[in-house]
Each structure stands twice: as C-alpha cells, then as structure tokens.
Amino acid sequence: MTVDVKYRTSATATGGRDGQASTADGSLSVKLSLPKELGGAGGPGNNPEQLFAAGYAACFIGAMKAVAPAQKLRVPADATVTATVGIGPRSEGGFGITADLKVSLPGLERTDAERLIQAAHQVCPYSNATRGNVDVGLSLA
C-alpha cells in the first residue's frame, strides 16, 4: 500500500498511561490517566481510548463530507458521530480495542444516510487503519 502523504504530524508521550502527551506544534497537551477499570486511579486526565474515539468521530464526519457530493447528498450542519471505544484482553493474548460509531444525520432519508455512512466507511482513514484489526460497528441514530 502506498500513501501520498499530504499532511504529517507528531505527538510525544511520556510516562505512559499516567503521563502526558503533546503535539510537536504545541496545539495539544493532555494529561493522561489510567481508568479505574484498567487498574488505575482514574485521575482527571484522558486516556488513549478517549483520544482515539474523538479522532475517529471527527475523521468520520470529514469522510462523510468528502463522499457526500458523489452521492448527491449534503451532510447536515448538525450531524454528529459518537464513537465508543472499548479495550480489553484478546483471546489470542495481548489487548485489543473495539469501536462503535453512532451516526446522526438529521433530515436525511434513512436509505440515503445508510448509503452515505457505508461510503464514508470505505474512505475514512481511521476505518482503513482499523479494517481487519478492530471490530467496528456502524449504526444510524
């Protein structure tokens, strides 16, 4: 697979799940905390799963906007994507994540909305990165 990279960014983490992460350009700096469910203190910071969920949700809206014109559709201004990301042990060993995307497209006919969601899932960079590795559920709110 070849990718014609148009944009590149980097982030650095220190301290692992109880540390901090920031982008090289300084636009994002987050304190990280391990959730109680994973044996941590559940502090005030964020965790990688939350950051992944936020990124996937935002990216998926962008993917819908990218494919909508070819479908002769417009993504409503009040469209939302809620990404729910889970983490846990895999039966094969190690840990894995799951993702469920709940998409709200007010004003679109159900068949149009479902077609748009499927088309976006084929081009979304997060969907392409997870395909074959992460169980991703798609639903229309």
What are these regions (language model features)?
Residues 1-54, 61-141:
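Extended beta-strand/beta-hairpin segments
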